[in-house]
Amino acid sequence: MSEHIILNPDETFTLNLGPQHPATHGVLRVKLTMDGEYIYSAETVIGYIHRMHEKMGENRTYNQYLPNLSRLDYLSAMAYCHGYVLAVEKAGSIEVPERAEYIRAITVELNRLSSHLVWFGAFIMDLGGFSPLMYAFDDREQILDLLESITGSRLTYCYYRFGGLYNDIDDEFLVGTRKFIIRMRKSLKTYRDLVTNNIILMKRLKDIGHISPEICRKYGATGPVARGSGINFDVRKNEPYSVYNEFDFDIPVYHEGDSYARYMVRMDEMEQSLRIIEQAMDKLPGGPIIPEKKPKIIKLPEGDYYSTVEAARGSFGIRLVSDGGKNAYRLKLRSPTFSNMHLFDEVCQGMLIADALALMGSLDLVIPEIDR
């Protein structure tokens, strides 16, 4: 709650933001109790597009459930598929060819860039700027073309398989990716000149929407939200998986905790993703992309397994309980956006509604991932 504003609970009114509203970026309702233009309290309401993804994971075989993972966070589908196949591979002791691991890293980071570009354009549009959205979507189109060339899809890829990949990459993909990296670095400079150093953007974001490290820990916030509050945690560095321990990259961390800090974390992350992609292509080995011998029907040993990856919005976890059958006895999906969203109710108290929408944009919510 702001120290400068004394709100009167006897002079409030209720304002519904959503569930159909462009600022919520999905079917999300926020029930606001307002005192003028200031927020007295807020309650996020979800459940409008709940699809029972966890229950489907218990009723379908492990292979049949793979397409579901691309339909949670549809902007970061590669990372979610990656987390699931890692959990099954870990539980089933399935070996993955080295070439497949490097290609996974390339495609995940390309998808992370694509996701951040959507966030960047939509976030600036929330603040009243339209042109950056066009710039961002133009760059994102290059990524979608690259991923479509190897997966056949532009959004819900379902590219990974247990033990490897659906399809190999070719020289044309590698050449196109290197051209994109050159283009993207020029674009990042344009974004800095056009947006990041813009005084209007700074006034809208700096010292606004402050999230303390304690609040992050209280709600389990991860990803750019936590790193914008000084919490130096990234699964790729702290708990390396796949071949991320082979790459040299930095984790952007800002300690201010305001909306501008979260903006800067994501902008800096785009350069780090480019570094990872470059190194992965330089070190890309030959060989197969999937083992010659692997079971057609996967049955995992009885046990309780957990796997986590760093998705575009934070730590995505899979808890998989097996009873030895062809499908999971219990499947739990740990959504980063679900945790990040719930701190909004506490942080926005005392804020102007316009600043609260900037705060919501800095959280980078994807509603289908919350409403699983």
Curated annotation (Swiss-Prot):
One of its GO terms (cellular component) is plasma membrane. InterPro entries: NADH_Q_OxRdtase_suD, NDH1_su_D/H, NiFe-Hase_large. GO terms for molecular function: NAD binding; NADH:ubiquinone reductase (non-electrogenic) activity; quinone binding. Keywords: Cell inner membrane, Cell membrane, Membrane, NAD, Quinone, Translocase, Transport, Ubiquinone. It is a peripheral membrane protein. It is found in: Cell inner membrane. The keyword NAD applies. Belongs to the complex I 49 kDa subunit family. NDH-1 is composed of 14 different subunits. Subunits NuoB, C, D, E, F, and G constitute the peripheral sector of the complex. This is NADH-quinone oxidoreductase subunit D.
